[in-house]
């Protein structure tokens, strides 16, 4: 999760575990690299889908705004102004596992639309 790179208000334990995953991946890359094994982490931002729609609906209800207004507010934190899709994540994973990614190891790769804050 991108929460391993940015702050996540009211979700400190979650964010802390995501920072830990980055350290784990970097350590695994050092340990396993001599055997030709690569380790990387994908850090998704806000992933489009039903789960995210429920989160947006709940936040909209609390703030007494429409779904669309809440969605736009959430997306305003990402410079690309769009959600990540499952396909985006799959394509990045495929690239990393392909011969094109053969020299990429120990990296925490954000797939997040340049989101500046989580939550």
What kind of feature is each model-predicted range?
Residues 1:
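Residue(s) in the substrate-gating loop at a strand-loop-helix junction
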Residues 5-6, 93-94, 100, 105-119:
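Short C-terminal tail/terminal secondary-structure segment
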Residues 6-13, 34-35, 81, 99:
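Active-site loop immediately N-terminal to the catalytic Tyr-X3-Lys motif
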Residues 17, 25:
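Active-site helix of classical SDR
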Residues 33, 38, 104-106:
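Short, small/polar-rich loop/turn modules that mediate ligand/substrate recognition or access, typified
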Residues 38-48, 97, 110-112:
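Conserved SDR Rossmann-fold cofactor-binding beta-strand/turn motif
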Residues 43-54, 58, 62:
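Short, flexible catalytic-loop segment of classical short-chain dehydrogenase/reductase
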Residues 66, 78-89:
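A conserved structural motif in NAD(P)-dependent oxidoreductases
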